Amino acid sequence: MDFFKKEILDWSVYLSLHYIARVCSNSSTSHIIQDYNLIRTYEKVDKTIVDFLSRLPNLFHILEYGENILHIYSMDDANTNIIIFFLDRVLNINKNGSFIHNLRLSSSINIKEYVYQLVNNDHPDNRIRLMLENGRRTRHFLSYISDTVNIYICILINHGFYIDAEDSYGCTLLHRCIYHYKKSESESYNELIKILLNNGSDVDKKDTYGNTPFILLCKHDINNVELFEICLENANIDSVDFNRYTPLHYVSCRNKYDFVKLLISKGANVNARNKFGTTPFYCGIIHGISLIKLYLESDTELEIDNEHIVRHLIIFDAVESLDYLLSRGVIDINYRTIYNETSIYDAVSYNAYNTLVYLLNRNGDFETITTSGCTCISEAVANNNKIIMEVLLSKRPSLKIMIQSMIAITKNKQHNADLLKMCIKYTACMTDYDTLIDVQSLQQYKWYILKCFDEIDIMKRCYIKNKTVFQLVFCIKDINTLMRYGKHPSFVKCTSLDVYGSRVRNIIASIRYRQRLISLLSKKLDAGDKWSCFPNEIKYKILENFNDNELSTYLKIL
């Protein structure tokens, strides 16, 4: 069979281990017996051997042992030969005999003796023996046995196994040890990692994601200074992964002060930028003053992108760091983007409450209007943040900002009704409100009536002839049409939908009064030769430019 051909012996271990690992990762141990078919039984297998196999739980949990009989299960008949080859030819388990013919099975046998005999066994089908005699290297074997005992690794390394063998993801055993590092078992992991490092495992070898073992050591929650220093001796301190993060980026993100200090002292690039434009300094500033001081005291001048760094601090609500950098003159919070966004607007956008309070207390200007028409008030409503809304209103925003805010709010159909009511309640009490109402633009002030969605539904259910009251108030652009229905009982009833309903009635009354003035003045002017030649639309456009007092004055004169 193909699996027994000499030219593919070098791949056999990889195939078998890869298959078993894949099957194990997709199945739970509680369903092994139900999901797998019994494919081979081995008799007279000593429990010591089973204990040894159990040291590879990711590979050998598809086995059952009882009464000196080892039962092997598989659910994929097409790959059965791979498992059989691994057990029969690699581990030399004989189907009807003992585990290894020259291995004395006794209660005193230990794993070390077993491994030595496994490596040095003269059996003609000994997979490891054949590989060593032919000077071959298995490219994938070590990468799948990270859960085995360290003595096994040492023996294999001493017999010429390739220490940086890669799996299908480009990971070496050193990669996998760091990937699966557990604090609860840190002592055994530390020992194995040291063995690999001291035997020359490549700390700069990249997997398919661009991670080197050294980058992983910096990225993961491993704080062993001894391991870090061993890696640092042979590592490229400015290596990058696929996102162009360097080791210094990761130790700064993890707030590993000692590691940051070591890397900077070794000349790591403090201005290296990842693909998002972030430097290691940006990653470290959110953790407090000690790391900031370390960077500022370095010999290399830091590249500071003011807008980027302030926004980074705002996103993480790092007030302490923000205050310290301001006191050192490193940053400036008084910036405006091309969209007219400020640091206070960013604090509202990112829900950074503590930073917002800090910036407002420094007399920051929060009455900004972005190029898209948004304000800090409208942004707080969009984020559904009542606490920030209360803080902003406590700073007494102007009427201009409140009107612009509510226009922006009503453009967003998902706005929070309660927060909109807060805006209306604040705005309606301002004494100069009437002076800003443009009676020609009732449509622009629909937010004034949109205080309660339940009452809006009532408007949609009330009909005047073939139109709903909602259509008349918000959809009809012809003022004359609106005036025709102004006295209808259903329309008048809806003016009570707002606690300030009198204002709605006053607006409608003002529209009627103004139209009457324009109509009267136009008739008076028609007596003149030239005025009568103008179309009515032009006449109205001209007269619309006068306020009510001017219209009344001209009427009296004429």
Swiss-Prot record:
Annotated InterPro entries: Ankyrin_rpt, Ankyrin_rpt-contain_sf, PRANC_domain
Pfam family, one: PRANC
Keywords: ANK repeat, Late protein, Repeat
Residue windows of the ANK repeats: 65-95, 169-205, 209-239, 243-272, 276-304, 339-368, 372-401
Protein name (Swiss-Prot/TrEMBL): Ankyrin repeat protein OPG189
Record's function text: Contributes to viral release without involving rearrangement of host actin.
SUPFAM superfamilies: Ankyrin repeat (SSF48403)
Family per record: Belongs to the orthopoxvirus OPG189 protein family.
Domain of life, per lineage: Viruses
PANTHER family: ANK_REP_REGION DOMAIN-CONTAINING PROTEIN, ANKYRIN REPEAT, PH AND SEC7 DOMAIN CONTAINING PROTEIN SECG-RELATED
